[in-house]
Amino acid sequence: MFRRPVLQVLRQFVRHESETTTSLVLERSLNRVHLLGRVGQDPVLRQVEGKNPVTIFSLATNEMWRSGDSEVYQLGDVSQKTTWHRISVFRPGLRDVAYQYVKKGSRIYLEGKIDYGEYMDKNNVRRQATTIIADNIIFLSDQTKEKE
């Protein structure tokens, strides 16, 4: 019953050696990022002449773990690592909503893709930048309500 649909799906993801030269255009790939964290700064809206405007902000995610050699897992010291992500929002509707409603300290969930690029800094030195391009943002907290 499910054999035929499963084979159809697998054919989309599997490339045979003999098809290498003819099916490169049809090959599927995946670039998805899911982040849950707190906004580190209020967003800024930037527009470079001749390019689409973009809303940019930073997002912190935390990884926590217990360390120690104790057999009782709960007795170890808690360690934490914070990772900062640069978020860019290009989609017109989402870009405007993010600029207006994303605030420093807000807890959000976002989906997007990772992008690696290069730019020239003020000293004309080539730098690499990693950016998360957001496709969807879900607001999990309202900063104004949390402050009350």
UniProtKB/Swiss-Prot annotation:
Gene: SSBP1
Main localization, broad class: mitochondrion
PTM sites of type N6-succinyllysine: K122
Modification type Phosphoserine: residues: S67, S79
GO MF terms held by the record: chromatin binding; enzyme activator activity; identical protein binding; protein homodimerization activity; RNA binding; single-stranded DNA binding
Keyword annotations of the record: Acetylation, Disease variant, DNA replication, DNA-binding, Mitochondrion, Mitochondrion nucleoid, Phosphoprotein, Transit peptide
Function: Binds preferentially and cooperatively to pyrimidine rich single-stranded DNA (ss-DNA). In vitro, required to maintain the copy number of mitochondrial DNA (mtDNA) and plays a crucial role during mtDNA replication by stimulating the activity of the replisome components POLG and TWNK at the replication fork. Promotes the activity of the gamma complex polymerase POLG, largely by organizing the template DNA and eliminating secondary structures to favor ss-DNA conformations that facilitate POLG activity. In addition it is able to promote the 5'-3' unwinding activity of the mtDNA helicase TWNK.
Chain coiled-coil ranges: none
Protein name per Swiss-Prot or TrEMBL: Single-stranded DNA-binding protein, mitochondrial
